[in-house]
Regions:
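FAD-binding core/adjacent interface of flavoenzyme oxidoreductases
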Residues: 1-11, 77-144
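Rossmann-like dinucleotide/flavin-binding elements
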Residues: 2-6, 10-36, 126, 132-165
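Alpha/beta-hydrolase active-site loop signature
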Residues: 38, 50, 114
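N-terminal Rossmann-like dinucleotide/flavin-binding domain of flavoprotein oxidoreductases
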Residues: 44-100
């Protein structure tokens, strides 16, 4: 059963999806948002955030601010996984675990999924030394011995960046 037609559907409620939702809501665009996990779930897992203007501390702290802003702006979020998005005439039909939704436009902000390194004991170092982004976290390892593990050119580019920190 289709609930109603929306002007825009936003898939993913990380920083990109939240920003899009805030701007659209401010312009009185009728939106519906979908997030299969919790709002800003990846952000909340960050150990330390020191590169986001106006926010200091943990990723949990930043995620808390994001959630407060979503609530303050009364942004509707359906906690459900989007299974299929299909164009049907002038509307997109969005199928979720909760049902079907129609929207005139769709913004996809699903982010990325990091590959597991598949190193024994990797889980025990989460938030305690394993990082997946030299630009994001490199400063945390300034003047320390580190190892870079990766695939092809990406690992080389990250290692070169870390040389200058």
């Amino acid at each position: 059963m289709i609930k109603k037609d929306y002007d825009c559907a936003i898939i993913g409620m990380g920083p990109g999806g939240i920003t899009a939702a805030i701007y659209l809501k401010r312009f009185n665009i009728d939106i519906i948002c979908f997030e299969k996990n919790s709002i800003a779930s990846k952000v909340s897992k960050l150990n330390e955030v020191d590169n986001y203007p106006g926010i200091f501390g943990s990723g949990e702290n930043l995620a808390k601010h994001f959630i407060e802003q979503v609530q303050k702006n009364e942004i509707p979020v359906v906690n459900s996984s989007v299974q299929i998005i299909q164009k049907n005439d002038d509307l997109f039909v969005i199928q979720t675990d909760e049902g079907f939704y129609n929207a005139k436009s769709v913004i996809v902000c699903t982010g990325i999924r990091e590959k597991e390194f598949k190193i024994p004991g990797e889980d025990s170092f989460e938030k305690r030394g394993i990082s997946r982004c030299a630009i994001c976290d490199g400063a945390l390892y300034r003047r320390r011995d580190i190892a870079v593990y990766g695939h092809k050119n990406t690992a080389v580019i990250e290692a070169i960046y870390l040389l200058d920190i």
